[in-house]
Design a protein with these regions (language model features):
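Venus flytrap/periplasmic-binding-protein-like
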Residues: 72, 120-128, 201-202, 242-264, ...
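Periplasmic-binding protein-like
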Residues: 86, 90-100, 118-122, 164-169, ...
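Extracytoplasmic "Venus flytrap"
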Residues: 29-50, 70-77, 99-102, 168-176, ...
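Sec/Tat signal peptide C-region and signal peptidase I cleavage site
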Residues: 16-22
Length: 416
């Protein structure tokens, strides 16, 4: 009888020990666009997250981080399905999500239905996500699409001498935000945007778009990414297009500059702006690039991290540093973690990042030009660095609010 009792005690101790071990895990859900037009962006986002784990590790005090990855296709519905599955089925406690603009607005709104959890934006860049009715438990450590265009319009006008441009953009919130930033600055300097065309995500035939481009412009701005960007460049070259090109942030990062085929060569000399630049000589950036390169075989990565890899890296870093500050304490609806995340200042690879009162990143922006490294590889070369870019782009908040939210027609081409 005593022997049996001892066995039960031992079994009970084992079960309690197992439960304790299970409680030592902090579960984090991660989403990325691993299907659809932006698949290549999502894949590199995951590389950035993995690079952060390689650099920082997964230990938080005596707890271990456990990650669950879910796929989306850049649509709001797919993002909400993925996040709901991660919460309800996988029982994650923290979300690192999402990647794309419309997804971000949807996940921000969804976050309000789960105030007990913490949501850290992975990479999405629509302005509305944090600027309009922000969620108290949603934190974004990357700038939005308009912030990523700061410096481009002025440089195009003052240095390149461009006076008239046309734009082509994917018809959704992130690219509206990118064009918003470009138009505000270019038109504010005295330039004209004479033609704005919008195409659905996943467009394969750009013939009518190319045919409708005006001839009397100094440059064409491309707010495209992923497969859309490659398809346009191929067809533009075949049509004999010769105009100067300007690019949005995901038009000229390594997701496109490393694409197979000759289409990317049309981008040589393209002026653009982004939250990073491949050739930046800052030691922190160079260290990150090496960590990314060392983490994956050369044929399983880009020559340099894309903007998505950098965003996922920074978001993962913020999460781990925040958790370590509070020793993994998720009590009281994760109140200590949320307070820490709001105050963290990241010494990120692409410059210092801090959050404003809406938990939106204030960071560094880069005006770049696409160059050949002499061996056939294309990179973005720094031509100007702009620090401390906030979400109102330096405008008085009251003036900025009156401009309106980014859309197909907002802002107007005028000086505000």
């Amino acid at each position: 009888m005593l022997k049996g009792s001892l066995g039960l005690v031992a079994l009970g101790a084992m079960l309690l020990s197992s439960a304790a071990v299970a409680q030592e895990k902090i579960k984090v859900g991660v989403t990325a666009t691993l299907e659809g037009t932006y698949t290549v962006l999502g894949e590199d986002g995951i590389r950035g997250y993995q690079t952060a784990l390689n650099t920082l590790g997964k230990k938080v005090g005596d707890k271990e981080l456990e990650f669950v990855i879910a796929s989306t296709d850049a649509t709001p519905d797919s993002a909400i399905r993925a996040v709901r599955k991660l919460i309800e089925q996988d029982k994650v406690q923290i979300l690192l999500s999402p990647l794309s603009g419309d997804e971000g607005i949807a996940v921000k709104n969804f976050a309000k239905t789960h105030p007990e959890l913490t949501f850290i934006n992975a990479a999405s860049g629509a302005q509305e996500t944090t600027f309009v009715d922000p969620a108290p438990n949603f934190f974004r450590y990357n700038m939005d699409g308009a912030q990523w265009q700061v410096g481009l319009g002025k440089y195009a006008y003052d240095t390149k001498g461009y006076r008239k441009i046309a734009t082509i953009g994917e018809d959704y919130s992130f690219v509206y935000t990118q064009v918003f930033g470009l138009v505000l600055e270019f038109c504010g300097a005295g330039g004209q945007v004479t033609n704005r065309q919008w195409v659905p995500l996943g467009t394969k035939d750009f013939a009518s778009v190319i045919a409708a481009l005006p001839d009397d412009v100094d440059a064409i701005y491309l707010g495209l990414g992923g497969a859309d960007a490659v398809n346009f460049l191929n067809q533009y070259q075949q049509a004999g297009g010769k105009a100067h090109l300007m690019g949005g942030s995901i038009m000229v990062d390594q997701t496109i500059l490393s694409a197979k085929g000759n289409a990317k060569n049309a981008l040589l000399g393209t002026l653009a702006a982004s939250g990073q630049a491949d050739t930046w000589e800052d030691p922190g950036w160079q260290k990150f690039v090496k960590a990314y390169q060392d983490a994956f075989p050369a044929n399983k990565r880009f020559p340099s991290p894309s903007l998505l890899a950098t965003n996922y890296y920074n978001s993962t870093m913020a999460l781990i540093l925040g958790l370590r500050q509070v020793n993994g304490d998720l009590s009281n609806n994760q109140a200590k973690l949320k307070e820490a995340l709001a105050k963290i200042e990241l010494d990120a690879p692409n410059g210092k990042i801090k959050l404003d009162s809406n938990r939106q990143a204030i960071g560094t922006n880069f005006v770049t030009e696409v160059v050949d490294d002499g061996k056939g590889a294309l990179f973005s070369k720094v031509v100007k660095v702009i620090p401390n870019v906030n979400q109102t782009l330096g405008y008085d908040p009251a003036v900025f609010a009156k401009i309106g939210l980014p859309s197909r027609t907002v802002p107007e081409c005028k000086k505000y």
